[in-house]
């Protein structure tokens, strides 16, 4: 059985070495993996509208489509920088893109995965923003704007929220993460995988926090026997 691979936040922003390295990594997965889960925030901002694709995004999206044609399942966890991605890309670049987590049953394990941006129940400002920015009325008004205005608006709104998010992630909130993951483990899952925090952690062999890929060049690998380990990403 080929591996199941979880990839943490990548935050690709433009053409360059990081983009080329990531595309090469995805290409290598065709020979080693059967399933890929992207844990959200693949780009600095990803909007579910094909007419807003920037060149670097188009190249990654084309590579994901290629992986699916090769027979790999590609699943996506919408993160705090993703806006209705599933509506535009499920069926082409992605198999699915659930907003509230997904379950992978692999190697005899039930693995629950979710981006993790809602782990901090005390961050009410962010929770309010998340609901507002993804609501149907806001999305409808946003779609009515010309593409350039839409991109400029998203960039400004994201910049205004970075301070709150940065404060929360300045130090890894281990107890918050443990409590958050415990709720999913209590449902009968064997392991929980989170992105969002940009650090690599394996807590008690059951809770795995994915490193930010662009800096670490590492990912979480699940073998056919259910063994879970962080490994260097081949290029």
Language-model segments: residues:
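Core catalytic region of metal-dependent phosphoesterases/phosphodiesterases
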Residues: 2-7, 12-106
